[in-house]
Swiss-Prot record:
It comes from Escherichia coli (strain K12). One of its GO terms (biological process) is transcriptional attenuation by ribosome. Makes mgtA transcription sensitive to intracellular proline levels. Under low levels of proline this protein cannot be fully translated, and a stem loop forms which permits transcription of the downstream mgtA gene. Keywords: Leader peptide. The keyword Lipid metabolism does not apply. InterPro entries: MGTL. Disulfide bonds: none annotated. This is mgtA leader peptide.
């Protein structure tokens, strides 16, 4: 997935992946 413009926490990144 492409990196979002807003810095998301690692927990959010894990959920996104």
């Amino acid at each position: 997935m492409e990196p979002d413009p807003t810095p998301l926490p690692r927990r959010r990144l894990k959920l996104f992946r």
